[in-house]
């Protein structure tokens, strides 16, 4: 399920808002999202076994954690509900990169959205190659756009974008 397949308007707000919603396992689609072991994951493969003597077809799910990239697998009867995370993506311009006082910790990012709202609560991504790419683009004076993904109470920079792709 792509983001276009979901209506996120019923999510609600605040800390008490649900971070997931139920969906029958048989309705999952490749490219959609699912929670496995309490982690938000993107489905990379699905297979459905035939109905057995106990009456339920089983859905085998192979997915990757959207924040760590770890591969996870799960199975569920096709008629049973699985938890699907609300996943939102945002694009921000990088205004500044501030080194952390502790060099063993990631630098902080100053970001601005399309409406001019700024935020300074995100760190550089843990992916060293991505963090290096952001820093090099920023240091060269180019406009750096980052894509932030939010799911299940976690937000993280997952990629960069060219300003022309905005």
Curated annotation (Swiss-Prot):
PTM characteristics: Lys-53 undergoes hypusination, a unique post-translational modification that consists in the addition of a butylamino group from spermidine to lysine side chain, leading to the formation of the unusual amino acid hypusine. eIF-5As are the only known proteins to undergo this modification, which is essential for their function.
GO CC term (a single one): cytoplasm
UniProt keywords, alphabetically: Cytoplasm, Elongation factor, Hypusine, Initiation factor, Protein biosynthesis, RNA-binding
GO molecular function: ribosome binding; RNA binding; translation elongation factor activity; translation initiation factor activity
Subcellular location: Cytoplasm
Residue span of region Disordered: 1-21, 101-121
Main location: cytoplasm
Acidic residues biased stretches: 112-121
InterPro entries given in the database record: IF5A-like, IF5A-like_N, NA-bd_OB-fold, Rib_uL2_dom2, Trans_elong_IF5A_hypusine_site, Transl_elong_IF5A_C, Translation_prot_SH3-like_sf
Family, per entry: Belongs to the eIF-5A family.
Name recorded for this polypeptide: Eukaryotic translation initiation factor 5A
Organism the protein comes from: Leishmania donovani
